[in-house]
C-alpha cells in the first residue's frame, strides 16, 4: 500500500458546513431553476419512465429523445452511433448510424454456464458478435439497434439477469474480489457485493414495464416510490467495490465506496475497512475537476456493512452537488465538507460509531493467470482477454467460440475480473484436462507478456460518444512498440501497469496506472506517470498533448534510467518519483500541481 495513505495529516483547512437536512425535496426540486438539467429530467420522468415506451414505437429514427437518452442510462443503456460512419452518412444526408450499448448488472462478476451460453447467443443474434468484459466486472453489448432492444432485454431476463442500474445516477454494478486461491474470503466478498447490489437497487417497476411489457403498478407512479432514492435518485454515478488483500484487482481506491476485508490468521473474516471518495473522471482544462483516491473512513463489523453502505450513499444523496454535474461525485462532496463531518453523519445514520481502520497490505492490482487451486480443492483458470473483447479473431484466438465450448461442458461458473479477464472457476480436478484441451484448440491465452497482462483499455472509438482519441483499437500496437523498448533495456519481464482511455472520464482507471495515456485529440494523448503499482496513489501529468507516434521515444529514456538506477524491488511508478522525474501526487486536489518533467532524463 502506498505510504501516502498513512502519512501525517495535512494542515487543517476550512470546510463548508454540511446541510442540516436533505436539500432536495420534491417541491423544491420542481421549481429550482439552479439545478442541473438532469435533475429536472429525473423529477419529470415518473420514476425513470419518461417517454421511453413511446419512443420505441417511432420507427422513423434509430434514436430516442434527448431526455430519454439520459433516462435510458438508468435502464443500463447508452445511445451511441458508429463514428467511423459519420462522415459518409453526413455526406449522404442520412441519420447517424445509431445503436445502443447495453451493460449488464452482474454483482461480483459471476455467471453460470447456462447464463454464459445465453449471453453468447444474444451477442451473435442482436449485437455486433462480441461480448465485452468491462473494467467493472460485467458485460457490455455494442451495436444493438432500437428495434432489437426489447428482444435483447427479454433474452437477458430469461436467464435471471438484468441491466437495471448498470448506468445512471444510482449505485452501479458492485465489484468483488476474485482471487481464486482465497475461496472463503472470495465467498464473503461476493456475498457482500450481492447484498449491496440488491439492497441499493432502484425499486421502480419501470424496467419491467417498458422492456418486458409488464403491467403498470396499480395507482401509477405515485405508488412506485423509491424509499431510498426518491424522485431525484443520486446527484451522480456511485460505484462500490469489495476488496480482499493482498490483491487490489478491483482498484478499491478508485471508487466512491469500498470495503476492504480484514481477515484473521485463518483467513476468516473479522470485518471491513471502509473507504470513501475515490473516482477517476475529470475534464481537460478544468482544474476544479480531478481524479481522487479514496480515504479510509473506518472499520465496521460484518453485520453492519449493509447499513454503512446505505448510509454512505444516502449522505451523498443529500449532500452531493445537484447544480453542477462535473462536481457532483462523492469525491467532491468530501472535499467540500471534509472527511470528519462526513464520517460523523454516516455514524449518525448507522446508529453507532465506526472503529478505526485495521492494518492491511496490498501488493498489486493485477490478476493471477493460469491454474490456481482454491482452499476448497476446486481449480480455477484465469485467461487473459485483450481489452476484454471476447470475439473470434481470424487467424488468431477464438475467444467467443472457445469459451462457448467450455461453457457447454463446464460444471462450475465463470468470473469476470476488474482487469477485463475471465476465470473458468470451480473446476473439479478431473475436468482440467478437457478444459486445457479446449483452451489449446481455440488458441485462448493463459498468460501474456508482463506489460500486456498489466494493461487496460476502454472502448473509445468508434462507438463511445465521449472519445477524443482511440484506445482499445490502438493499445495493442502501442504495447508492441513499448515492449520492444523495454526489451532493449532488459525489462521485458518487468510488471508495469499501463492503461489507456480515449477521454479523461477514466473508465479504464488510467490515473492509478504507473503509465497512463489519456486521449487529448485524434492521435494525441496526455502521458501520466508515477502511480503506485497497488493502485493506492495517483499519477502526475508528465507530458501534455503527445503525438501517438512519439510516445515510445518519450518513454524510452525513462526505461533506460529505470534499468540503470532502480533499487531492488522498486516499481517503475515509485522510481520516477524517487529519481525526481515527476512529483508525487498526494491526492486529488494537488493532481494538477507541479506537472510536467521535474528534470531531464540523463
Curated annotation (Swiss-Prot):
One of its GO terms (cellular component) is sulfite reductase complex (NADPH). GO terms for molecular function: 4 iron, 4 sulfur cluster binding; heme binding; metal ion binding; NADP binding; sulfite reductase (ferredoxin) activity; sulfite reductase (NADPH) activity. InterPro entries: CysI, NiRdtase/SiRdtase_haem-b_fer, Nit/Sulf_reduc_fer-like_dom_sf, NO2/SO3_Rdtase_4Fe4S_dom, NO2/SO3_Rdtase_4Fe4S_prot, NO2/SO3_Rdtase_4Fe4S_sf, NO2/SO3_Rdtase_FeS/sirohaem_BS. Its cofactor is siroheme; [4Fe-4S] cluster. Its EC number is 1.8.1.2. PROSITE patterns: NIR_SIR. [4Fe-4S] cluster binds at residues 458, 464, 503, 507. It catalyses: hydrogen sulfide + 3 NADP(+) + 3 H2O = sulfite + 3 NADPH + 4 H(+). Residues 1-23 are annotated as: Disordered. It is an enzyme of class 1 (oxidoreductase). SUPFAM superfamilies: Nitrite and sulphite reductase 4Fe-4S domain-like, Nitrite/Sulfite reductase N-terminal domain-like. Siroheme binds at residue 507. The keyword 4Fe-4S applies. Binds 1 siroheme per subunit. Binds 1 [4Fe-4S] cluster per subunit. It comes from the Bacteria. Keywords: 4Fe-4S, Amino-acid biosynthesis, Cysteine biosynthesis, Heme, Iron, Iron-sulfur, Metal-binding, NADP, Oxidoreductase. The keyword Nucleotide-binding does not apply. Component of the sulfite reductase complex that catalyzes the 6-electron reduction of sulfite to sulfide. This is one of several activities required for the biosynthesis of L-cysteine from sulfate. Belongs to the nitrite and sulfite reductase 4Fe-4S domain family. NCBIfam families: CysI, PRK13504.1. Alpha(8)-beta(8). The alpha component is a flavoprotein, the beta component is a hemoprotein. This is Sulfite reductase [NADPH] hemoprotein beta-component. It comes from Methylobacterium sp. (strain 4-46).
Amino acid at each position: 500500500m502506498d505510504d501516502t495513505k498513512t502519512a501525517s495529516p495535512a494542515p487543517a483547512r476550512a470546510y463548508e458546513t454540511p446541510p442540516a437536512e436533505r436539500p432536495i425535496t420534491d417541491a423544491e426540486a420542481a421549481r429550482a431553476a439552479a439545478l442541473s438539467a438532469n435533475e429536472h429530467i429525473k423529477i419529470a420522468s415518473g420514476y425513470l419512465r419518461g417517454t421511453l415506451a413511446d419512443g420505441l414505437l417511432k420507427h422513423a429514427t434509430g434514436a430516442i429523445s434527448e431526455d430519454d437518452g439520459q433516462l435510458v442510462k438508468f435502464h443500463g443503456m447508452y445511445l451511441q452511433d458508429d463514428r467511423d460512419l459519420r462522415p459518409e452518412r453526413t455526406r449522404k444526408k442520412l441519420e447517424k448510424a445509431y445503436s445502443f450499448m447495453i451493460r449488464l448488472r452482474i454483482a461480483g462478476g459471476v455467471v453460470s454456464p447456462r447464463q454464459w451460453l445465453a449471453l453468447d447467443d444474444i451477442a451473435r443474434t442482436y449485437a455486433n458478435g462480441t461480448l465485452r468484459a468491462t473494467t467493472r466486472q460485467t458485460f457490455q453489448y455494442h451495436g444493438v439497434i432500437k428495434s432489437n432492444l426489447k428482444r435483447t432485454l427479454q433474452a437477458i431476463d430469461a436467464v435471471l439477469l438484468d441491466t437495471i442500474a448498470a448506468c445512471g445516477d444510482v449505485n452501479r454494478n458492485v465489484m468483488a474480489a476474485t482471487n481464486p486461491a482465497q475461496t472463503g474470503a472470495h465467498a464473503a466478498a461476493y456475498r457482500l457485493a450481492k447484498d449491496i447490489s440488491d439492497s441499493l437497487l432502484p425499486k421502480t417497476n419501470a424496467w419491467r414495464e417498458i422492456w418486458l411489457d409488464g403491467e403498470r403498478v396499480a395507482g401509477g407512479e405515485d405508488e412506485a416510490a423509491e424509499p431510498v432514492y426518491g424522485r431525484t435518485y443520486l446527484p451522480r454515478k456511485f460505484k462500490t467495490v469489495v476488496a480482499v488483500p493482498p490483491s487490489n484487482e478491483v482498484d478499491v481506491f478508485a471508487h466512491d465506496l469500498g470495503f476492504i476485508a480484514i481477515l484473521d490468521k485463518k483467513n476468516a473474516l473479522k470485518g471491513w475497512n471502509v473507504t470513501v471518495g475515490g473516482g477517476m473522471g475529470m475534464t481537460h482544462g478544468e482544474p476544479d475537476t480531478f481524479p481522487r483516491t479514496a480515504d479510509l473512513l473506518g472499520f465496521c463489523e460484518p453485520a453492519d456493512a449493509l447499513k454503512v453502505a446505505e448510509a454512505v450513499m444516502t449522505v451523498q444523496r443529500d449532500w452531493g452537488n445537484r447544480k453542477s454535474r462535473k462536481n457532483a461525485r462523492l469525491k467532491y462532496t468530501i472535499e467540500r465538507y471534509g472527511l470528519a463531518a462526513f464520517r460523523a453523519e454516516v455514524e449518525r445514520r448507522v446508529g453507532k460509531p465506526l472503529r478505526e481502520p485495521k492494518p492491511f497490505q496490498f501488493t498489486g492490482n493485477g490478476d493471477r493467470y493460469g491454474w490456481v487451486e482454491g482452499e476448497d480443492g476446486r481449480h480455477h483458470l484465469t485467461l487473459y482477454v485483450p481489452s476484454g473483447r471476447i470475439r473470434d479473431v481470424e487467424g488468431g484466438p477464438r475467444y467467443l467460440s472457445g469459451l462457448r465450448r467450455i461453457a457447454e461442458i463446464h460444471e462450475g461458473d465463470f468470473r469476470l475480473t476488474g482487469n477485463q479477464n475471465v476465470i473458468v472457476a470451480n473446476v473439479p480436478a478431473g475436468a482440467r484436462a478437457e478444459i486445457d484441451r479446449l483452451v489449446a484448440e481455440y488458441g485462448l491465452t493463459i498468460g501474456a507478456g508482463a506489460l500486456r497482462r498489466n494493461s487496460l483499455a476502454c472502448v473509445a472509438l468508434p462507438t463511445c460518444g465521449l472519445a477524443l482519441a482511440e484506445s482499445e483499437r490502438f493499445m495493442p500496437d502501442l504495447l508492441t512498440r513499448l515492449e520492444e523498448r523495454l526489451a532493449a533495456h532488459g525489462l521485458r519481464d518487468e510488471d508495469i501497469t499501463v492503461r489507456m482511455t480515449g477521454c479523461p472520464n477514466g473508465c479504464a482507471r488510467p490515473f492509478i496506472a504507473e503509465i497512463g495515456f489519456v486521449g487529448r485529440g485524434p492521435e494525441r494523448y496526455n502521458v501520466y506517470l508515477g502511480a503506485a503499482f497497488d493502485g493506492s496513489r495517483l499519477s502526475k501529468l508528465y507530458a501534455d498533448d503527445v503525438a501517438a507516434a512519439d510516445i515510445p521515444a518519450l518513454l524510452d529514456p525513462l526505461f533506460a534510467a529505470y534499468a540503470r538506477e532502480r533499487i531492488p524491488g522498486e516499481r517503475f511508478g515509485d522510481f520516477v518519483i524517487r529519481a525526481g522525474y515527476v512529483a508525487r501526487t498526494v491526492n486529488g486536489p494537488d493532481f494538477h500541481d507541479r506537472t510536467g518533467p521535474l528534470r531531464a532524463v540523463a
